[in-house]
Design a protein with these regions (language model features):
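Residue-level "contact hotspot" at macromolecular interaction interfaces
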Residues: 51, 63-66, 100
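Intrinsically disordered, Lys/Arg-rich N-terminal extensions and targeting peptides
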Residues: 1-52, 125-137
Length: 137
């Protein structure tokens, strides 16, 4: 039996959707690690979301750490989690542990643009804010 197939994405069966996500290769897991951009960045670059990277400044939108901000210090594609500085909890023995967040629960406030490919993608995707034409019925 196959362990993963790209065709399972189109299935409506929850078991196949789970199998698709759990057994996906890393290049597919990267597509799951996208986060929304802030309204300012969205307007500037003409994109709604982008893959999250180490060094991006993010704001937590959901959960017990809601409205906290920090920089992404680690991205774990296998588990689909990100780790943000300042978003940590204290264990019973007193040590601090960084809390794992899902990329869908954060919003990117500032982008890390040291990567030339990422910068080129953002610059190339700038869309002019022209009004959409209404279709005739």
């Amino acid at each position: 039996m196959k362990s993963w197939s790209a065709k399972w994405k189109s299935s409506t069966q929850p078991r196949k959707q789970r199998k698709y996500a759990f057994n996906a290769p890393l290049h597919t897991l990267q597509k799951f690690a996208h986060s929304h951009l802030s309204p300012e960045l969205r307007k500037k670059y003409g994109m709604r979301n982008i893959q999250i990277k180490v060094g991006d400044k993010v704001k937590v939108l959901r959960g017990q750490f809601k409205s906290k901000e920090g920089k992404v210090e680690r991205v774990d594609l296998k588990d689909g989690k990100i780790y943000v500085t300042g978003v940590d909890y204290v264990k019973k023995n007193g040590s601090k542990v960084v809390f794992a967040l899902r990329p869908s629960n954060v919003m990117i406030l500032e982008l890390q643009l040291a990567d030339k490919k990422r910068k080129a993608k953002l610059e190339g995707s700038k869309k002019t804010s022209s009004p959409k034409l209404e279709s005739k019925k």
